[in-house]
Amino acid sequence: MSDMFRKSVLNKLPHLPPTRAPWADESEPIEEIDEEDEQLDGIGEFKPATMGPSKHDTQDYSPLSASTFFAQAAEVQPPSTPCTFRVYLTPPNLSIASANAGTPPGPSGLRTQQQTNRHGTYLVCHHGGGASGLGFAPLAREVKAKGNGEMGVLAFDCRGHGKTSTSDPNLELDLSHDTLLSDFMAIIEMMFPDPKESPSLILLGHSMGAAPVVSAAPELQKKGYTIPGVVVLDVVEGTAVESLPLMKSVLSKRPESFRSVIDAIYWHVTSNSIRNVESARVSVPHIIVPAPSSSSSDPSANPGGKQVWRTNLVGTEPYWEGWYKGLSQRFLRTKCARLLVLAGQERLDRELMVGQMQGKFQLEVMSDVGHYLHEDNPAGLAATLITFWHRNTRVLVLPPKIGAPGPGARGGPVEVKQVGQQ
């Protein structure tokens, strides 16, 4: 594995003492490092767990309620799965969508019209491994604000994460690609049982979540759902597969526990795991759980005390490769608009590079964000998503030619071809 690649992977991780990677800037002071120390188990260390914010730190690290960001929360139990999923959603404002169906003509006399589904449009979000649906909370608020409420947002905690529960604990860590896909399809079909009466669905997946989302798009289209676009956040198959040997080492550097929820939020912010304090305050409490007390095996028996990770990511190792193998090919084959959003100058693999040169998908690169780009800069991502949605669900109404028949004859909107469609 080249130093350049390792640097691209580790740039997503916190750069904090006491350990610094051997390829760091030579102008900065650094202790002598033997070649034998440059092994995988010695790179990319996280900041160790701390005693929490100091008395002089005026920043508020207390947890925030999801109600500030989402309009509703629900428990969804599809009959085909052993899980009861926690779902968060903000429905679209259909009255606003209808009122904004057309736009006034510009200087050229051209007019655009929104291809509105009378049931609205939802952005459906699938989080990555170890995260939760509330990682999309600030994004949901920004999408509502920047889209004038026309686009709804739905996010959920996938199996083995957040507030989702599983009837058989042995199935909590079954996070294979097929299981994630089956769960995702079951939630969609439970929330929107009739494809003809369903809103349009723009599917978004972050990291691990990209795998089921990309695979679900054609399956949902076969069932009659309208899927205007698919969005993938910060994952490239080639880079992801190459980085898998690093993952166990990276996970082993995380603290095993925290003294409290506030300490966990503080660690995520100060380690640069999440660079947005507000987002950390709403998302972090849902990726940790109270540690079992010495007298009870029930994690809820110790509320407010020592906290441990909700999801055993190391236990999902058998499924890691399955999340990413074939992802680029499936992404490029989806019959809808495609958007790939990356954090920093991540390199594309061969298939995506060729696809990008052929104009098969839209590529956006966000700066000054980490791997959790939707948490670090929700406003910037929301603006990109709203533009992507409008671009791929609008028609161009051309003015009639001189001497041409009036409206109703040969006139009418000319549909703009969607990005990435053949």
From Swiss-Prot:
The active site is at S207, D234, H371. Its EC number is 3.1.1.89. It is an enzyme of class 3 (hydrolase). GO terms for molecular function: protein C-terminal methylesterase activity. SUPFAM superfamilies: alpha/beta-Hydrolases. It comes from the Eukaryota. Keywords: Hydrolase, Serine esterase. Gene3D superfamilies: alpha/beta hydrolase. It catalyses: [phosphatase 2A protein]-C-terminal L-leucine methyl ester + H2O = [phosphatase 2A protein]-C-terminal L-leucine + methanol + H(+). Residues 1-27 are annotated as: Disordered. PANTHER family: PROTEIN PHOSPHATASE METHYLESTERASE 1 (PTHR14189:SF0), PROTEIN PHOSPHATASE METHYLESTERASE-1 RELATED (PTHR14189). Demethylates proteins that have been reversibly carboxymethylated. Demethylates the phosphatase PP2A catalytic subunit. Belongs to the AB hydrolase superfamily. This is Protein phosphatase methylesterase 1. The lineage of its organism: Eukaryota, Fungi, Dikarya, Basidiomycota, Agaricomycotina. The gene is PPE1.
